[in-house]
């Protein structure tokens, strides 16, 4: 039987190269190997302050980008989290099975809590949604009973909580649940900032020259890569501790060479990048990285422009219907186990 995989992506603004290589590229591979569910996590987006118009546009832009990079609605189920009320219900069921202590010890919550101010009466001015976020995530996952959940390091603790909750529910309510396995793409899990390669590439970076966005035009990509941080070793090799900037560029280039649009460049550089660049300069590395990046982005941008709002809507409606069939089956299982619903009074 084909394994089932699930991932959720927040539509929090423009997508960058780190998003593509860290998540999207692996989804294109997974849709060929698994029954893949991909949802836009818009319920998670509203756990912090948000603007409705921006949320709607971000949702549209993300779905259009996912389709442009190669996610195929015939092979993967793509949908909006908020289109299925089952997500909210499962999130609530997970919340009542969790306890305050385990939610408060989540690293992301503690970090965001430290950034918050206090109200005049001394209470913390922090949205409750930030605290219950991991419970909703656990509900998202268990609703589809996946075998595989691709994750980044920043979500690993939340996913460990999901497994804990699943085991707790299995023991207490005698439900048979799949315990999902969490997988990471070790090569591209942490694409770093080009300007400051000690930090992960992020749209919140203070210096935007270190972030390559999927809608960046060629001249902007050329400028950003040309200004990328290197070092004084003048040696091109994978050395994360001593040469983080060069290592980051090699990592990105290696991942980009998997793309069909870079086949000719792959033939030129070969499989051993350290060997190829052993007699080359940092400028040669930057030129190769620029070519590979521009090839990818031009292809994505061209395809994005061809995707209409109607296509996005139709894709999401089809995905909603497909996802709902699975979600309702799972939620019915939980209702029976918990003793919820009028059907349990017959």
Swiss-Prot record:
Q: List the disulfide bonds.
A: none
Name the gene: trpS
Q: Which purpose does this protein serve, as stated in its record?
A: Catalyzes the attachment of tryptophan to tRNA(Trp).
Query: Where can this protein be found?
Result: Cytoplasm
Query: What residue intervals hold the motif 'KMSKS' region?
Result: 200-204
**Gene Ontology terms: cellular component:** cytosol
Provide the assembly information: Homodimer.
Name of this protein: Tryptophan--tRNA ligase
